[in-house]
Every structure is written in structure tokens, then in C-alpha cells.
Amino acid sequence: MAYPLQLGFQDATSPVMEELLHFHDHTLMIIFLISSLVLYIIMLMLTSKLVHTNMMNVQEMEMIWTILPAIILILIALPSLHTLYMMDEINNPLLTIKTMGHQWFWSYEYTDYEDLAFDSYMITTDSLKFGELRLLEVDNRMVLPTDLPVRVLVSSEDVLHSWAVPSLGLKTDAIPGRLNQVTLTSMRPGLFYGQCSEICGANHSFMPIVLELVPLKYFENWSASLAQ
């Protein structure tokens, strides 16, 4: 989860988020090199007294500033396409959950189980227990097993919402009349927080998302207890 004064990303919990972090570092390094080169050229021009007023056409320079940006764009595009295809790929999910956005709460339905569905509301500040996080805790968490592919179907009952969990690299729009899907696989257990990431009305900031990722054995016990 995020911490006060944090400048970087949250710790990656899924393979997708790890790829996104690698791509971010890769792109940031390219931007740093380009910025350093441009700054060096600017400083060179400001400090040099040499002026070339008779140079109307330099074929070599034109080739360099045409070919070099093309190579840079290819170096950015290839890992970007790899990550995009990885995010869109769905390989035999073992569990499917339907997530519906409402003003202003989430509802979850485990479609592989009978009558396993619930609403998830934010816990108000005066109802928080010691150690719980303001504006991020909910009364019913989405519980999922770790190390297994899970498909999440996302839609909305009223207006536009967005179901987002940063540490898993997830952000999917919830659009009325449209069913979007995303796959997640967690590499470790824990509590992971997210929020609605689309302005959806007066209480937009009061739509937290809490994923509780547990080993498969505990998930089976939890689902069996709710089914009873």
C-alpha cells in the first residue's frame, strides 16, 4: 500500500505490476538520457562563440535526427507491446468474480458459487478500529486465493466508475451496459487497497476497494462459511 511522503510506486504484488515497473524504469532511463543530451547541446550553444551562419543543409545531421528518434521509439514500443498483451491475456481463470459499481459502493458476486454475493461499503471514520485506515476500510472485503489466475468482470449500475488496485497493476473502467474484464494473479498474501479512479459524483472519494489475498485453503474455508 502507499505510505505518507512516498515518491515511488507501491510494491508489486502481481507479475503484471512487475512488468509495469520494469517498463517505467526502462522508459525513464531513455527520457533521462535524452534530457541530458538536450541540456548538453543547449549549454554548448550558450557558451560557444562559434556561429555557423553559412550552413543551409547538413545531410548527415538530418539523417541522425530522423533515424535516432525512430530507434528510440522502437525501444519504447517493443516492451510496451509485450506488457499490453500480457495485461490483456486471460489463461484459464480458476475463479470469476463480477464487480458492479454503484453510487457509492461496490458489489461483488462470485459466479462460481451459488448465492455468494455481497456489497462493500466504506467504514465511516467514527466506526474505525485501532490501526484501520481512514477512507480505505470496508465492511466486506473481496477475498481471493493467491497464486491462482482470477478473472474479474467489471461493470456499473449507474454512472462511470473505475475499479483500480495499484499494487496489482489493475485499473478497469466500470461502464453501464458494458462488461470489461481483467485478470489478476497475486504472488503473496496480504491486504491490498484501491479506490474508484473515475469521478462519479459527490461521494466519489468514498468508494474504497480492499482485496484480502489468502492461501487457497483459507479461501475455501471462507467461501464455505459464507455459503452456510
UniProtKB/Swiss-Prot annotation:
Alphabetical list of CDD domains matching this protein: CcO_II_C (cd13912)
PROSITE patterns (alphabetical): COX2, COX2_CUA, COX2_TM
GO molecular function annotation: copper ion binding; cytochrome-c oxidase activity
GO biological process: ATP synthesis coupled electron transport
Subcellular location: Mitochondrion inner membrane
Domain of life: Eukaryota
Keywords: Copper, Electron transport, Magnesium, Membrane, Metal-binding, Mitochondrion, Mitochondrion inner membrane, Phosphoprotein, Respiratory chain, Translocase, Transmembrane, Transmembrane helix, Transport
Residue positions where Phosphotyrosine is found in the record: Y218
Record-listed Mg(2+) binding positions: E198
Protein name as catalogued: Cytochrome c oxidase subunit 2
